[in-house]
């Protein structure tokens, strides 16, 4: 049931988990890297098919753009929303209380719009770099897994900005056992991808530390939106590193 809960939360795949309010949602975090690998496997498969088609010759950037759209579609844009909200809240000179209010505001501000555009452009360019060689495609499987593993670490280690927010809800039941399962899963996935799989496993937690420490400094802790921003920053940083090495 925890596995189905993770699939239902992190993707738009048509699963119907049996929700049990007595089961702490944090237990599902043990499967986050596995779901990330599922997302990445779909993306790698689509990328392989695109590279074998006539699309790269007809429109070189189109396969990468379609893959980025598929990435957002599979996840339902869940983490992109958190990234945009965090850009609006974290980069304006206001009080901690005002930042938390901005996170609740459903409207997209200028910082959020620019931040979202920059993130997607960088991600698009990195995907284009990875799709230059079939040997790099396994990285697409590891990147989403490593980013969600980094999220599990952040949720376990860093404090919450609100004791009753969404982040607090999803962290309930997250313990050392879940972190250990997520870590072993992420390491195995990276190892199966070869030496290039190590790159996301190193870069994703570093990106997580940057976002988490910024959130602690300006919000007092992590929120549900920060969780999403961590995933997006970790994915993007890992993609950039993977396409440069």
Residue spans for each PLM region:
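Hydrophobic alpha-helical transmembrane segments
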Residues: 1-76, 91-100, 105-245
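Juxtamembrane transmembrane-helix boundary signature
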Residues: 77-82
């Amino acid at each position: 049931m925890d596995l189905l809960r993770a699939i239902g939360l992190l993707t738009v795949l048509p699963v119907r988990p049996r929700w049990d309010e007595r089961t702490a949602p944090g237990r599902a975090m043990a499967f986050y890297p596995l779901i990330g690998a599922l997302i990445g496997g779909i993306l790698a498969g689509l990328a392989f098919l695109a590279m074998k088609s006539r699309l790269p010759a007809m429109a070189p950037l189109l396969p990468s753009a379609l893959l980025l759209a598929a990435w957002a579609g599979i996840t339902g844009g869940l983490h992109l929303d958190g990234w945009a909200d965090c850009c609006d809240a974290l980069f304006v000179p206001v009080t901690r209380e005002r930042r938390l209010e901005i996170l609740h505001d459903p409207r997209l501000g200028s910082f959020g719009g620019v931040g979202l555009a920059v993130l997607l452009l960088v991600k698009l360019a990195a995907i284009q770099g990875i799709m230059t060689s079939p040997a790099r495609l396994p990285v697409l499987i590891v990147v989403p897994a490593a980013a969600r593993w980094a999220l599990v670490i952040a949720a376990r280690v860093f404090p919450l900005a609100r004791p009753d927010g969404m982040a607090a809800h999803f962290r309930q039941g997250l313990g050392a056992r879940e972190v250990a399962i997520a870590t072993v899963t992420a390491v195995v996935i990276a190892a199966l991808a070869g030496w290039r799989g190590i790159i996301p496993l190193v870069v994703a937690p570093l990106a997580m530390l940057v976002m988490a420490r910024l959130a602690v400094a300006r919000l007092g802790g992590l929120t549900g939106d920060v969780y999403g921003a961590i995933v997006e920053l970790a994915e993007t940083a890992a993609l950039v590193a993977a396409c440069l090495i």
